[in-house]
Amino acid sequence: MTSSGFLRAHPGVVRRCGFTRGGGLKVGPCALTDPGLAWVHAYYTDEALNWLAGLDNPLWKSGADVMDLLPGDMYVSEHVFKKILSRVGPEFFDSFIPIREVEECILFGFSPLSSTGMAALKAIDLVYGGYAPAAPGIPMEVYAWEMAYKIGAAPRLLRWVLIEGEGIEQFATLAESGLRGSLRDYIGTHPSGCKTPMDLGLVVKNVHGLVAALGMLMDSNIYHGDLKIDNLTVTEPGGPYKLIDFEFAHPFEARMRPMIEARGPITWLMPGTPACNPPEHDEETPCRDRRMKELGVTWQLGLIMLETIVLDEALVRDENMEWKRPDFKRLVSAVMEENGSLAPHDPRLLEGYLDLIGECLKRDTAVRMDLVTLMTELSLLIEKFKL
């Protein structure tokens, strides 16, 4: 293995004994003493370890906050590291130190290439996805991600590779991570159990920016395909909201040449997330009406707008839509009061925002608010309340 970055040209001996007594692995104000991370010292240079120890983050108040901000279920083992390294090559790890992982296919860690200092490497078997019609040879996921990044609507995609193998292909990406995983994580609970009260004015401005970005992408024939709060993040305190996970990105007609077979374009079905799909969504039939497609995006934005202020996934994604009742506003206000999700605000601003949510979440597409009107109404709220 050769390296010109953080990785050692020749790995050292993994010394689990004494790892804890030696202070473990230092990440900013945090010392990780689990011996399962001893391999990091063996594979990464002193320069990399010193960089990791000197990391800072505006949300780190103590060592306990470091791991609280980093997603993942468990620490990355040497076995998992070597397995992914053999798949994607050292280039991915020369500027990325993985610490946590999910199902051995998504690694979360730290990178000097990221504006937040944090990054995520995703390496999965390729069972879905096509090439961008507007950029031959470039996966639609990459094309959409980079176009979104250019307009400030996505974190930076640092590296990607399509790995061809015997009978199966894999796709790997390395990208900036948000300050605290997804938007839900960012506005969710702290270790103390307390919610992070949100500034409603800031929420309105961030949603306005998101709607504008989605409109620009759709004007470029790019549809995200899986809009939900889990696929949004923030890379700066307070916002803006940025899109992540472009796996289902597609052009309007959803016709793309597959990445896994050497054949012509096919029409893809867009599964998305069932609980977040609009009522009119048909998993078996691609949408052929641009207005209907846009109204589906409006529905998904309504769910995002709702969940951002109530912080209650079960309520928002209830398949029976129990929240969609005549006393909708009273129900939402009660949940918000119980969750303590909003900082003190002008009740008239909340009233106007809830009105927009209600308009976005009308089941009848004939009366559901369209994207242009939503953009206009959000602009009026920003102007009226001097946000």
Curated annotation (Swiss-Prot):
It catalyses: L-seryl-[protein] + ATP = O-phospho-L-seryl-[protein] + ADP + H(+); L-threonyl-[protein] + ATP = O-phospho-L-threonyl-[protein] + ADP + H(+). It comes from the Viruses. GO terms for molecular function: ATP binding; protein serine kinase activity; protein serine/threonine kinase activity. This is Protein kinase ORF16. Signal peptide: none annotated. Residues 82-381 form the Protein kinase domain. The active site is at residue 226. Keywords: ATP-binding, Kinase, Nucleotide-binding, Serine/threonine-protein kinase, Transferase. Belongs to the protein kinase superfamily. Ser/Thr protein kinase family. Its EC number is 2.7.11.1. ATP binds at residue 122.
